[in-house]
């Protein structure tokens, strides 16, 4: 543990800046803020909407993809030119990945019957176009399926929200009130109990 910790702290260019989790959970680190108090946030087919209007996407907006080559590995020089760090890429070499890759249609094989190399990469549109245009090296590029996205807040199966279709969710503003219902309670319950420290009870009519 100590050796690994030292390795990470001493190599910020490789692993990035180490951010410590605050003791006060109300001061959590925010990587990207897209909505403010009083706004209604929604994501429709990957597009962030505020109060029903699409916001301007960042120039270097990234999505995760699975990239299969025609056989060779992607050269380190190309990764450097694209700006993809070693920490941001995963080579899916373990045989345990094969079923999932085949289900996505990443089925290109070499003469020995082994699947051609597949990478999991975060790509901007420019990176995507550059790779896709290299027909000698790149066989297929598939956007990461929702099943790989992990958990979404709130942890409630009934919302069926995912990272590309999320909400709408109203962001509470100071002094404003909202009527709690069985449908919206999962959204605000944790905020009320864990962050505001209030007691919440649901009573029958």
Which residues are covered by each model-predicted region?
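Soluble "head" domains of membrane/secretory-pathway proteins
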Residues: 1-205
């Amino acid at each position: 543990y100590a050796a690994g910790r030292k390795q990470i702290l001493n190599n910020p260019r490789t692993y990035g800046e180490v951010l410590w989790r605050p003791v006060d959970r109300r001061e959590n680190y925010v990587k990207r803020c897209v909505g403010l108090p009083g706004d209604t946030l929604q994501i429709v087919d990957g597009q962030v909407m505020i109060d029903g209007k699409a916001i301007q996407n960042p120039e270097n907006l990234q999505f995760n993809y699975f990239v299969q080559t025609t056989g060779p590995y992607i050269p380190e020089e190309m990764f450097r030119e694209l700006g993809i760090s070693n920490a941001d890429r995963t080579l899916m070499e373990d045989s345990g990945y094969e079923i999932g890759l085949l289900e996505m249609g990443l089925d290109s094989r070499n003469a020995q019957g082994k699947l051609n190399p597949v990478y999991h990469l975060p790509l901007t549109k420019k990176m995507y176009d550059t790779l896709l245009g290299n027909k000698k090296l790149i066989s297929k590029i598939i956007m990461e399926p929702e099943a790989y996205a992990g958990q979404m807040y709130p942890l409630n199966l009934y919302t069926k929200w995912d990272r590309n279709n999320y909400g709408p969710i109203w962001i509470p503003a100071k002094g404003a009130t909202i009527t709690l219902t069985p449908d919206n309670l999962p959204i605000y319950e944790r905020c009320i109990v864990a962050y505001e420290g209030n007691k919440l009870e649901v009573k029958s009519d």
